[in-house]
Regions:
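Catalytic-site neighborhood detector that most strongly recognizes the C-terminal catalytic loop/helix
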Residues: 237-264, 268
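Flexible interdomain linker/hinge and immediately adjacent N-terminus
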Residues: 1-39, 169-171
């Protein structure tokens, strides 16, 4: 028998993409992580790993970044000077930094760091996004930077990236590579995302193991279902409307009239 090669790339998260609000569905995983957060005093390492898993998913969901950009995001702690723009451009990396004026954590990434840097989306301008202080995101970032991240490093050389591995005696580096970051994400989904009827744990029945690339599918599909706009969906994943139409067109709501009515009916709801 010949193995079927053309597998549906959306299969692992189809149960999420077919929901009316895919992002609200996927968000259940981050809620599950918070619900099962270990006590940091009794189980410091387990708590640090849970916070890291929470932030991987949350920052991925807020930014729509590709795996490499998320994995290589540098950290500039509060009170420290941000890395020069030139350094970030040369190393093709972004940085998570504290914006004192806005009172928020900001993701700053030069356009050259992106796979599609020549895309009309960027116009040679950097990507800048203030992370919203919603559902304890800022609190968890602060706790991770101050307590959990140093614990995960365990005295190993600091690679400077926001996300670091749990350093073991055999570890040569605290940096994630493409494989280890994918495995960390997949493990998070297996532990918190996939509903297990025997234990009652896990957020979503029917979900399958997957990696960080699927987050972009969730965001694009969510916006497409809510707005019917390829253009708005493209903003969420730093891409073009053509690419979104090509990849996600099948998830566009079939009943366009209902979609338009949903937008218009808001006015009557407000009255």
């Amino acid at each position: 028998r010949v193995a079927r090669v053309h597998r549906d790339p959306f299969e692992p998260i189809l149960v999420v993409l077919e929901a009316e609000r895919p992002l609200a569905e996927y968000r259940k995983i981050t809620d599950e992580i918070l619900r099962r957060m270990p006590d940091a005093r009794r189980h410091p390492k387990a708590a640090a790993e849970a916070v890291r898993a929470f932030l991987m998913l949350r920052i991925g969901l807020h930014t729509g970044l590709r795996q490499r950009n998320l994995r290589e995001l540098m950290l500039c702690a509060r009170g420290a000077a941000p890395r020069p723009e030139r350094w970030l451009e040369q190393h093709r990396r972004g940085e998570l930094r504290w914006d004192e004026r806005a009172g928020a954590w900001e993701v700053y990434i030069p356009s050259v760091a992106f796979k599609n840097s020549g895309s009309s989306f960027f116009g040679k301008r950097p990507f800048r996004l203030h992370l919203p202080d919603l559902s304890s995101l800022q609190e968890q970032i602060d706790a991770y930077v101050e307590r959990h991240r140093p614990l995960l490093l365990g005295g190993c050389g600091d690679p400077g990236t926001f996300f670091v591995k749990s350093v073991k005696a055999t570890s040569r580096t605290a940096s994630y590579d493409q494989t280890t970051f994918y495995e960390a994400w997949r493990l998070t989904i297996q532990r918190y995302g996939i509903f297990n009827p025997y234990t009652g744990r896990g957020a979503i029945p029917g979900l399958l193991p997957h990696g960080p690339h699927n987050v972009r599918d969730v965001l694009a599909t969510h916006i497409l279902k809510q707005t019917g706009s390829y253009e708005q969906a493209s903003y969420a994943i730093q891409d073009t409307p053509d690419m979104v139409a090509q990849h996600y067109g099948r998830f566009l709501p079939q009943d366009k009239a209902t979609l338009a009515a949903k937008v218009l009916n808001v006015v009557w709801d407000e009255a």
